[in-house]
Amino acid sequence: IELNGKDISDEDFAMTITAVKVAADSIVQKGVCEQPTQFEILTAAAFLYFHLQKVDYAVIEVGLGGLWDSTNIITPVVSVITNVSLDHTDRCGATVARIAMQKAGIIKEKVPVVTAAEGEEALGPIVTMAMFKEAPVYLYGKAFYGTEVTSSMDGQKFTLHAGDYYHSDY
């Protein structure tokens, strides 16, 4: 969990994890749900921390797939699907198309989708879900692209080109 590029303090991490764990144990004891996974606890702690810090925006990365991921409870300003490849095949499916369907599960009603997915097998399910949800789709290489300026262990800098919009030094 980070805020403005800095890791959450040990004290804040302990406080948010403890608060979420106490709440989770309470609802499990009442039979409302099963014991949450470690990732679900961490996700809830991140949401709590961002709420307490009153952040304007948060970048939330899905843990696995998208459709059934614990991060999928939010309605984002924009949904980003970076690429689609054969990873997590034991849970997301054995083909690029099935994995793309899982990833497309993050698409929300009328929320823009930005993707760098390539090929019909990957793009098909994403574009289909976006059409169903009336969500505009912006494809990397068509609607926008980036040009790398520098890359190091400290991060990357690139120039973003998006239609008439141009900005440097991200």
Where do the protein language model's features map onto the residues?
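ATP-dependent carboxylate-amine ligase catalytic core
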Residues: 1-74, 90-92, 120
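Acidic, Mg2+-coordinating active-site environments of NTP-dependent enzymes
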Residues: 27-31, 41, 52-61, 76, ...
